[in-house]
Amino acid sequence: MGEQQLDCALDLMRRLPPQHCDKNLTDLIDLCPHLVDDLLSTIDQPLKIAADRETGKQYLLCDYNRDGDSYRSPWSNTYDPPLEDGQLPSEKRRKMEIEANAAFESYRDLYFEGGVSSVYFWDLDNGGFAGIVLIKKEGDGAKNITGCWDSIHVIEITERARQAHYKLTSTIMLWLQTNKSSSGVMNLGGSLTRQHEMDAPINDQNTHLANMGRMIEDQESKMRLTINEIYFGKTKKVMSDLRSTEKQSELEKQDEIVRELNNAMANRGN
């Protein structure tokens, strides 16, 4: 019964607007308090933004930079609120973290023309390591259109001699809302999750960053194409069909004229 309830809850959350995720998740937990741990660990929530007290730069919050009620900034490597014994990445991972944050800032500006990004790394018990790349871009409300893009990429790396195995899990949450006098209010949103694994040669940590960068870039490109062609394309078709029902009689007349012209041309050919 518990597994069935969890599956139904996850299926429901996939169909609800991402911008209301916090409220919907709270309501689900109230309905099924015994599923609280599973729901919190399974459901991706829209990313929240904080500002580094030392540098003033913005960064994104997630479970992987959290220790208790404090969050670690990727810029100063300090916790807010301050935490004396908070978990910190090893020197090797911290160096990679600094380089990755700089690289994905450039990636974010190139593909999203702004927004906020954060990268965090940590060591795994099996000798490998893992990281998470977060990107958030909010719409500016121009032309009465608001919205937000959140992408979450969790990647696990296992080194084998001069080879590395990469396992990537990517989630994109997107919502758009238009409010125009001519068309009224329309909400469009949802989430998409994909996984991908690959093996690649390595020389040093810079090779890791290059491999991860290409992998994430390719994954985001494919997911963006899927969202654009399948989800937005299907919505556009549905809206077009709804609008065309008012002129159904005119369309039928046009079809009849086309058939008559085709028949006339066919008879002339005979």
Swiss-Prot record:
Q: How does it assemble?
A: Component of the F-actin capping complex, composed of a heterodimer of an alpha and a beta subunit.
Sorted alphabetically, which keywords does the UniProt record give? Actin capping, Actin-binding, Cytoplasm, Cytoskeleton
Q: Which GO terms describe its cellular component?
A: cytoplasm; dynactin complex; F-actin capping protein complex
Q: Which compartments is it annotated to reside in? A: Cytoplasm, Cytoskeleton
What's a single GO MF annotation on this record?
Answer: actin filament binding
Identify the domain of life: Eukaryota
| A Pfam family annotated for this UniProt entry | F_actin_cap_B
- One Gene Ontology biological process: embryonic axis specification
Q: What is the lineage of its organism?
A: Eukaryota, Metazoa, Ecdysozoa, Nematoda, Chromadorea
Principal localisation: cytoplasm
UniProt key word Cytoplasm: yes
Extract the InterPro entries matched here.
CapZ_alpha/beta, CapZ_alpha/beta_2, CAPZB, CAPZB_N, F-actin_capping_bsu_CS
Task: Reply yes or no: does the keyword Nucleus apply.
Answer: no
Functional note:
F-actin-capping proteins bind in a Ca(2+)-independent manner to the fast growing ends of actin filaments (barbed end) thereby blocking the exchange of subunits at these ends. Unlike other capping proteins (such as gelsolin and severin), these proteins do not sever actin filaments.
- Gene name for this UniProt entry: cap-2
**In which family does this protein belong, per the annotation?**
Belongs to the F-actin-capping protein beta subunit family.
Q: What span is annotated as the signal peptide, if there is one? A: none
Q: What is this protein called?
A: F-actin-capping protein subunit beta
Q: Which organism is it from?
A: Caenorhabditis elegans
